[in-house]
Each structure stands twice: as structure tokens, then as C-alpha cells.
């Protein structure tokens, strides 16, 4: 039979030349060719070689042994110690607990160590997180204490005298310490065992590490593959957007909402070429290849996948505005299907519907593969073949490829051959050229939300479609759809945060200053009380607006999951409303934090503060403050209180991991009644486990404080100018019960000073005094204070004053000075003389500070004042955050390792009692009132 179209000579040549693109087949020729192909299809239907492909939903029904897949998943979960998390899923709070593991850089020894090793390293943004290598011959103290007894029970000791025949099968089924685990199997097992919020955290951290993200999660146990839309909701990316005409600018958006062309890479039957290696090469600019997709040449990459076949991964290329780095002019998504398309047809169908082009890697095109692809004849997607043909298969491949040309509407330029002699660099350039040609022509652009919509139509489960998530989303939309202008909404709906609150905060500051006066006039004190009462009565005269009432209903839900869903939806919904688009050069915007460039005026923010969840909680706090003030003054009977339950609601949010505002970023004051009420409720909920260590960070904006805390403890403090509120926030970390006695506390309360310390000079008057007071408050509440610096000698004057004031009170936290190199990852760290300079006797600034605090010549070197020894790890150099140029840069391994070492030292200091006396919550409440 004559082959339709133009004869394919490509396979005979053994290479593909993109420079010689054959003409497209005419419409009349294509109709004839397709008709011939239809005839051949019917002929093959009668062949005895019946072909069936898996649809991804009922694979077990087509299998003679339907329990094989089920047992394979169960064996993997059991091997990894995750079988107990199939009903009660592993939560984010579980994964963040401080334990023995937190203080040791131990290597996993048995498969059950692998999930925890992965989570711990991923939390620290460690590029080695995916490595599943286990080390058996290690020193005894290299393994966590709490797991030693467990390991002794698991190790199987073989006695040669035993009856081998009687026990060989049971022995081979038991997990052994050297059982290799493919990293993709580990990821799938962990995601299947995690709740929605831990899945989201895993995806967020993987994105920061520039790992490929799971998009479709296979579940061979229930034959329900899940599209992970919710898991990717929190991922924001920044890239250079260059319109065809006009000036380019940086754009920041969610990967879920932004649309981009998508290109899928799949395998049909077998392929000698690695899809993942090819994708990594295409995505990597210059000569530095980043292993975004795990591939066969990496450690344990050749291990058989037990449960991760059918996994679809996604990664993006984002332009930076630099010609030497930008492979493509716009964002591009790349998708990778693990496994053969014939066994995972549902996933393949999804990829063909969402992709602008699909690259099919195969060594063989026979009758089975032809019938498989023939069913795609109505598809409008572009198809490209990357072949590495078997010796002796040339004629078969040629015959069926010629049949597919009219069916898939392709020509010779859509077929590439890559064999061992093919130059890899040239081949990668060809792939990039194809992608570039598709981008220049009209092509479909899809967001992850669009992909999820296509997945639903095909019958895939979408994680976001659960009832609790959708109810929370509906509630969020009822609030945000009324927000047309953030400033107007704050003025009209959050009424207690206007002038009455600012005036009340000012009166309370004056009243507090009178407390320290030698002989304050009683008349002035009474006047301040009267003014404060008037302002509080004015606030109490309002009722919560409809939006605030809806918010209160959302956080009052009896379902913990619905409450957490609602808070996440509110964060994203409010961020979407704000639509902040900064216009800054790449070196400032893409570092996730502003440069340190002089002083900050606390009265005038450097950027507009976005409307956030903290504003709704602040409104609740003001209702509680006003009501409490009236009760204290005898103007309102305690039995008539309407808002007494508000602190309890807020304390529950703190326990779920939400950062709560400690110092108001608008008035730069602490709502004492609200904070103490919240801590009292926290004390009630924690019951016997209320011993606290307070750890704070202070320093000027732009020194990486929030990123440091988030990396160290897995916290959620806001980073970057566009989303950072100005106040100080606190988050609670739980210490595992088995470790709390050893560490000496049950929880660690972490305080991030945000943008409160602006580096004001002493000549700035009231502004400087305000900064010094705030620094004194934050450091005075703390057992441990991390001083974050942008320069080795750059200690803000306000912090020097706080040192002096705290020395007079006798309260001296354990200080750690952290110098962060914000730009150069190659700098090894400050030299010893640099460390000495930081703590040397003070110059003019220190002497002036001493005179203001009336300490005269008694001012000592900072080394003595802060109990620092430069040789004993009180001063830290943290390398740059990024390895490479953002937005395609990954987090530096040196940064991750330095943060881990700082964390280990902090915990060791707490454990050894070097962090001053630990507190319980009641003592912290008294300290808040006193300070």
C-alpha cells in the first residue's frame, strides 16, 4: 500500500534538520490519507493482536491480578512508616514540631526515616532534600535518640542455622535498612499521607528549591488521580514582562492564575532518551544545568518506580529581563508524565488538551502505538516525535510514522532523531527553537486553574473541590467582592482603625510615660483617663460591619479544616484585590526583600500597606479593647460584654500556625488588653504545656529577618515589600512532648519585628525615641534575640539604646548577631577582625547613646554588654539566599546549611539554659504589662 503524504527520509538519515521544513500536506491530500488510514484502522481491528490502553480509572479491572497495585502502594506506605496517616492525615503542625531531630544533621538509616528527612530538609530549603540515600554504617550518636530503640526492633538478624526454605518468603517481604526508594515514590507516598495544608507547604518549598512540582498525583490504591490545584495556590512568582511595544516591567502573580503556553513531554512504550534530562537542559540557561526534574543519572534515579508512574510534574521558565539568561521571551510551562502513555491514557489526554505542543519520546512505533495515536486524530495540539530507533526497526517505524503524518497533521519537521552520536547541545537548541516557533505563532495559553477545569471534564479529582474548601471560598468571596478600593474599605468597614484608634494609642503612650515619671501631676493623669474613655466609648458605639461579621463567622467554624481553608482564601483574595505591581530593578525586586539603603521613616511607609487578614483581626482587637476599657472604668457591666470571646478565637488561630500581630503597624503601639487577653486564652488551651521561650529578630528592613525565620522553623511570616505588613508578628512553634523536658520548654514563641526598626538617627527626635522603645519592648520580652544586620558594623542606634536600657533592668537575652550577605554567595564570611570590629569598644555613636541613657563613661564594649564572644558562634555570616539569578535561581545550599547551623546553636543555647530564665505564659503576660 502506498504511504500517504511525503515519504519520511528522516529515520534513514539518523538525524533531523530543523532548517529544512517540509511543506504542509494539502487539505485534499490529507482527506485522502486519513480515509486510507481509517481503512487500515478497521483492518487492524480484526487482527489477533488486540490492543487495550489504561484510562487511569479502571486499570485494576483490566488486570488478572487486581490486588497487585493495591499491595504495591500499601507495601510502600508500610515501608516508609506512613500507613498510620491514611485516615488521620499528617498535618503541617505535626511536621514543624521541634524534636531531637531538629538539632542533628543525621543521615537516614532505614526507609521510615526518609519522609521526615525529606520534610526537614525541604523546610530548610535544602537542595539535597530529594536524595533518598540511606547510610547504614554511621556513628551511634549520628542517629536521633528517640529512634534508636525503634531501629533495634526493626533490624532483622539472620541466623545461618535457620531453615532457609521455611522462612525465605516472609523474610523477603519485610522492609530492610538497605531497601532503595525512588525519590518520586517517596514524594507520592508523602503527599498521599498529608493533609491539604501540608501538601501546600511541600509544593511551596519545592518551588523555592526550583524542583518540579507534582500536578497530577496518582493513587493506584483507589484509582483516583488527583489534580493538585489547591496545593499550588500559595506559589507566587515574579518575572520580567516585555510587551511587543512599550516598556517592559516586572510582574508578580500566582502560578495558579497566570496564563502561559504549556509544552508536554511524554514517553510512548520505551525510550533510550531521558525526558527529564532533556527538560532540565531546555530549562537551564548557559552551561549550568539545574536538576529541576529528577532523572535516571541522579542518585537512585534508576530505581524502579513502584507507585509514582502516572505522576504529572510541572515547572516553568520565567524571564528575568537579561538577554544572556532569557531562553524564552515569556513564561512557559513544561509538563512531564512519568510512565508510558498507554498505561496512563487519562493523564495523556489531559496533557493533549492543555498543551500547545506535545513531545513524544519513543524508540518504537509499531501497530500498537499507531492505534494509540490514531485515536487523537481530532486533536488540535501540535505533536513532535523524538526517536531513538532500535536497530532493525527502521522500516516498521518508517511505515507507521508515514501513516501518522496526515492523522496528526504533522510534517517532517515534527520528527527528530536523537541517538548516542547526536550532539546534545545542538539538540537542545533545536527543541528550544521549536518551542520559540510555537510561541511566536498563535497558541493556547492556560493557567493552572484552566488545567484543573480540563481535568474535571476528564473525570479527574481536583483537590480544591472538597465541600469545606468551597464553603470557605464562598465566604471569602462574599467579603472581597465588596472591596473596590482598599483605602475606602478600611475607612468605611474597618471603622475602629481610623482616627479614634490613632488618638487612643497616642493617649495610652502618654499615660505610659507618666507611669515612669518621678512625680506625675494627678490632674494630667485624670485628663488622659477622661480622653481615653471618650475615645473608647466612641469606638464601642459602633457595631462590626457586615464584612467583619462574615470574617468572624469564618474563623468561628467548628471545623478546623474549614477555618484554615477560610484564612488561606482570605489571604489570597485580599492580595488579589490589592493588585500591587511594583516597578523596580531586578536586583531589588527579585531578592524577595528591599535593599538596606538608609533610614526609614516610621510615620511614612515606604510602600502602601496592603489590606490583609491582620486588619480584620485588628478590628476585632479594637472592639475588645474598647469594651474592656469601659468595663474597667465601670461604664459597662461585665455581664453585658459582647466581644469577650474574641481573644479565644484569635488564640486558636495562633495554635494553627497563623502569625498574629503583636505591635500594630499602623499606630506603632501594642494593644495591651487584646494581647494579654489572647495570651490568657492561650494559657487555658495549652493547659499544662505552657512553658515558653521567646525568640525575636530585630533589625532594619531588608536584612532578610523574615526569610531567615521561615527557613529556620518553617514559619509563615510575610516577605517582600509588596506583601509585608509593617507591624511585629508572632508565631507559636510546638516542642514535641518527648523533647520538651530536655529542651526546658513546651513551645517557642517567635516574634518578627517586621519594618518597625527603620534605622533612625538619634537626631530624629521622637521618631528615634519610638524606635528605641519598640526595640526595648521586643528584646525585653525575649529569651533569645537575633540581631539581623546588612553590614558588619551596621547596628542601628535604636538597638544600642535598647541594650543599655535592658542592662539597667537586669534582663539580658542571649544575643546572636547575624550578618547576611544579600548579594554575593561566594563570600566565605567575615574575617576574625571583622567580628572583632563589630564588638569593639564603641565610637562616637556608642558614646552618644551612653550619654543619652546617662551611663557616662561606664559604657562598655558591646562584647561585654551582649555577653558575646566572637570566637563562640555569637556572630554569624549567612551566605546569599539565591544560587544564580532570580527568578530561575534556586535557594543556595550554603544558605540552607548556615541557617540549619544557626538553628542548632539557638536550640543548644536554650537547652543549656543560656537564654536567660524561661517563662510560662502567665509570666509573659506580666512582662507585657510591665514593659
UniProtKB/Swiss-Prot annotation:
Look up keyword Cell cycle and say if it applies.
yes
What UniProt keywords apply to this chain's record, in alphabetical order? Cell cycle, Cytoplasm, GTP-binding, Nucleotide-binding, Nucleus, Phosphoprotein
What are the Phosphoserine sites (modified residues) in this protein? 3
Work out whether the entry's keyword set contains Nucleus: yes
Instruction: State the source organism's domain of life.
Output: Eukaryota
Q: Do you know which InterPro entries this protein is assigned to?
A: G_VLIG_dom (IPR030383), GTP-bd (IPR006073), P-loop_NTPase (IPR027417)
Q: What is its main location?
A: cytoplasm
Residues in VLIG-type G domain copies: 689-929
GO CC annotations? cytoplasm; nucleus
A single GO molecular function, which one?
Answer: GTP binding
The record's section on Pfam families has: URGCP (PF25496)
Q: Which PANTHER family match?
A: UP-REGULATOR OF CELL PROLIFERATION, URG4-RELATED
Its annotated function is as follows: May be involved in cell cycle progression through the regulation of cyclin D1 expression.
Its name, as the record gives it, is Up-regulator of cell proliferation
Q: Which organism is it from?
A: Pongo abelii
Amino acid at each position: 500500500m502506498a504511504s500517504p503524504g511525503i515519504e519520511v527520509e528522516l529515520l534513514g538519515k539518523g538525524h533531523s534538520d530543523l532548517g529544512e521544513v517540509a511543506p504542509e500536506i494539502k487539505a485534499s491530500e490529507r482527506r485522502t490519507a486519513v480515509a486510507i488510514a481509517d481503512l487500515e484502522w478497521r483492518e487492524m481491528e480484526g487482527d489477533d493482536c488486540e490492543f487495550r490502553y489504561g484510562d487511569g480509572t479502571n486499570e485494576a479491572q483490566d488486570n488478572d491480578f487486581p490486588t497487585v497495585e493495591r499491595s504495591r502502594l500499601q507495601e510502600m506506605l508500610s515501608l516508609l512508616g506512613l500507613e498510620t496517616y491514611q485516615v488521620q492525615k499528617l498535618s503541617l503542625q505535626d511536621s514543624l514540631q521541634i524534636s531531637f531531630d531538629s538539632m542533628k544533621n543525621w543521615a537516614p538509616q532505614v526507609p521510615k526515616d526518609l519522609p521526615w528527612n525529606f520534610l526537614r530538609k525541604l523546610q530548610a530549603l535544602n537542595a539535597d532534600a530529594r536524595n533518598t540515600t540511606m547510610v547504614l554504617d554511621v556513628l551511634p550518636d549520628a542517629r536521633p535518640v528517640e529512634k534508636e530503640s525503634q531501629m533495634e526492633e526493626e533490624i532483622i538478624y539472620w541466623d545461618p542455622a535457620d531453615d532457609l526454605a521455611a522462612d525465605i518468603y516472609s523474610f523477603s517481604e519485610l522492609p530492610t535498612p538497605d531497601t532503595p526508594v525512588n525519590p518520586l515514590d517517596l514524594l507520592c507516598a508523602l503527599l498521599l499521607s498529608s493533609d491539604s495544608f501540608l501538601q501546600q507547604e511541600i509544593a511551596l518549598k519545592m518551588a523555592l528549591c526550583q524542583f518540579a512540582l507534582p500536578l497530577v498525583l496518582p493513587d493506584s490504591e483507589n484509582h483516583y488521580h488527583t489534580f493538585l490545584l489547591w496545593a499550588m495556590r500559595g506559589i507566587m512568582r515574579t518575572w520580567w514582562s516585555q510587551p511587543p511595544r512599550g516598556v517592559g516591567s516586572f510582574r508578580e502573580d500566582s502560578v495558579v492564575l497566570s496564563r502561559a503556553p504549556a509544552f508536554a513531554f511524554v514517553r510512548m512504550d520505551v525510550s533510550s532518551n531521558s525526558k527529564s534530562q532533556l527538560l532540565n537542559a531546555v530549562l537551564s540557561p548557559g552551561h549550568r544545568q539545574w536538576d529541576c526534574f529528577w532523572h535516571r543519572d541522579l542518585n537512585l534515579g534508576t530505581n524502579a518506580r513502584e507507585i509514582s508512574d502516572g505522576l504529572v510534574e510541572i515547572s516553568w521558565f520565567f524571564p528575568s529581563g537579561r538577554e544572556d539568561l532569557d531562553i524564552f521571551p515569556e513564561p512557559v510551562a513544561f509538563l512531564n508524565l512519568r510512565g508510558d502513555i498507554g498505561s496512563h491514557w487519562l493523564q495523556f489526554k489531559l496533557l493533549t488538551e492543555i498543551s500547545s505542543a506535545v513531545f513524544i519520546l519513543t524508540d518504537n512505533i509499531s501497530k500498537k502505538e499507531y492505534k494509540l495515536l490514531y485515536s487523537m486524530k481530532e486533536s488540535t495540539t501540535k505533536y513532535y516525535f523524538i526517536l531513538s530507533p532500535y536497530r532493525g526497526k527502521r522500516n516498521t517505524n518508517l511505515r507507521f510514522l508515514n501513516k501518522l503524518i496526515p492523522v496528526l497533521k504533522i510534517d517532517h519537521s515534527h520528527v527528530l532523531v536523537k541517538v548516542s552520536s547526536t550532539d546534545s547541545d545542538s539538540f537542545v537548541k533545536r527543541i528550544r527553537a521549536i518551542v520559540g516557533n510555537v510561541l511566536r505563532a498563535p497558541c493556547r495559553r492556560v493557567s493552572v486553574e484552566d488545567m484543573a477545569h480540563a481535568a474535571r471534564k476528564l473525570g479527574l479529582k481536583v483537590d480544591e473541590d472538597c465541600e469545606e474548601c468551597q464553603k470557605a471560598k464562598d465566604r471569602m468571596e462574599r467579603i472581597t467582592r465588596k472591596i473596590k478600593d482598599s483605602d475606602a474599605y478600611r475607612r468605611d468597614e474597618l471603622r475602629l482603625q481610623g482616627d479614634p484608634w490613632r488618638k487612643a494609642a497616642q493617649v495610652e503612650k502618654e499615660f505610659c510615660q507618666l507611669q515612669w515619671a518621678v512625680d506625675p501631676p494627678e490632674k494630667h493623669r485624670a485628663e488622659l483617663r477622661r480622653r481615653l474613655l471618650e475615645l473608647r466609648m466612641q469606638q464601642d458605639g459602633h457595631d462590626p460591619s457586615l464584612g467583619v461579621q462574615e470574617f468572624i463567622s469564618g474563623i468561628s467554624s467548628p471545623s478546623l479544616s474549614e477555618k484554615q481553608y477560610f484564612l488561606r482564601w482570605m489571604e489570597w483574595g485580599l492580595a488579589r484585590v490589592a493588585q500591587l505591581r511594583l516597578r523596580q530593578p531586578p536586583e531589588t525586586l527579585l531578592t524577595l526583600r528591599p535593599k538596606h539603603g538608609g533610614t526609614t521613616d516610621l510615620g511614612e511607609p515606604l510602600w502602601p500597606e496592603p489590606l490583609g487578614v491582620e486588619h480584620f483581626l485588628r478590628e476585632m482587637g479594637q472592639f475588645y479593647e474598647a469594651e474592656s476599657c469601659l468595663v474597667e472604668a465601670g461604664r459597662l457591666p461585665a455581664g453585658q460584654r459582647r466581644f469577650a470571646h474574641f481573644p479565644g478565637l484569635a488564640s486558636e488561630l495562633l495554635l494553627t500556625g497563623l502569625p498574629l500581630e503583636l505591635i500594630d503597624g499602623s499606630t506603632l503601639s501594642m494593644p495591651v488588653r487584646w494581647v494579654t487577653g489572647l495570651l490568657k486564652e492561650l494559657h487555658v488551651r495549652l493547659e499544662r504545656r505552657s512553658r515558653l521561650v521567646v525568640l525575636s529578630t530585630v533589625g532594619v528592613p531588608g536584612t532578610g529577618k523574615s526569610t531567615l525565620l521561615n527557613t529556620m522553623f518553617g514559619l509563615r511570616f510575610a516577605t517582600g515589600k509588596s506583601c509585608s505588613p509593617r507591624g511585629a508578628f508572632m508565631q507559636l512553634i510546638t516542642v514535641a512532648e518527648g523533647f520538651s523536658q530536655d529542651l526546658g520548654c513546651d513551645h517557642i514563641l517567635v516574634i518578627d519585628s517586621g519594618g518597625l526598626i527603620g534605622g533612625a538617627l538619634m537626631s530624629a527626635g521622637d521618631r528615634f525615641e519610638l524606635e528605641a522603645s519598640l526595640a526595648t519592648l521586643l528584646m525585653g520580652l525575649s529569651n533569645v534575640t537575633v540581631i539581623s544586620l546588612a553590614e558588619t558594623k551596621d547596628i542601628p542606634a535604636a538597638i544600642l539604646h535598647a541594650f543599655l536600657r535592658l542592662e539597667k533592668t537586669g534582663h539580658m537575652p542571649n544575643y546572636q548577631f547575624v550578618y547576611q550577605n544579600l548579594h554575593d554567595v561566594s563570600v566565605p564570611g567575615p574575617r576574625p577582625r571583622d567580628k572583632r570590629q563589630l564588638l569593639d569598644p564603641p565610637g562616637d555613636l556608642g558614646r552618644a547613646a551612653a550619654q543619652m541613657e546617662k551611663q557616662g563613661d561606664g559604657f562598655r564594649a558591646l562584647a561585654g554588654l551582649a555577653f558575646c564572644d566572637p570566637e563562640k558562634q555569637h556572630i554569624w555570616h549567612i551566605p546569599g539566599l539565591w544560587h544564580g539569578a532570580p527568578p530561575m535561581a534556586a535557594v543556595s545550599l550554603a544558605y540552607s546549611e548556615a541557617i540549619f547551623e544557626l538553628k542548632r546553636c539557638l536550640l543548644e543555647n536554650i537547652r543549656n539554659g543560656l537564654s536567660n530564665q524561661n517563662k510560662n505564659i502567665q509570666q509573659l503576660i506580666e512582662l507585657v504589662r510591665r514593659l
